[in-house]
Amino acid sequence: MYTIHKDFNFLKNLLTEFLSQPDLIERFQIMKQTKISGWETWFQIELAIFLQQHENVAEWERESRHSLDKRKKDYRNNVSIDFYIRQKYAQESIPLEIKQNEVARKCIRNMINDIAKFRSIRHSSLRTGREPWCLGIHNKVTEKTIRDYLIDYELNYLENCLWIHEVPNTEYMVTLF
């Protein structure tokens, strides 16, 4: 349990810093004003650049491919994990999936599907024993609304490992679980 809380706090602090960057906030505002959609890959690239320069990140990897366990629900033969992030002095990396959808409910559902996808990876293919985390970027809604979605989708999550955060000066927010 200690590792889960430690990973959560590391990711939360890292992402708080990332989402507070003035240039990133300006781009969020422009995307909203111009109605640009489908920017999940852009977000991942921005995060990769941030991770590369961050003093508390020892290494990171993006789009790591894994074989699926055929005994479990079949999505495809292989699947990619968006990020593995290893904190300095840590032995293993933290898997992080990222989802972006303007509609918060759809974003949360897609995040939950990514957790299921991670659980379908063949154990011998995994790089880490760490629990997977999902970060969703969506339009602002109330915290209660997010919690209601999690109940609706029957997601079992640790209450103190849920982070709902408004991206400063934008119409977006993030959810991490």
Regions found by a protein language model. Give the residues of each.
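Acidic-basic catalytic patches of nuclease active cores, encompassing PD-(D/E)XK
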Residues: D7-L68
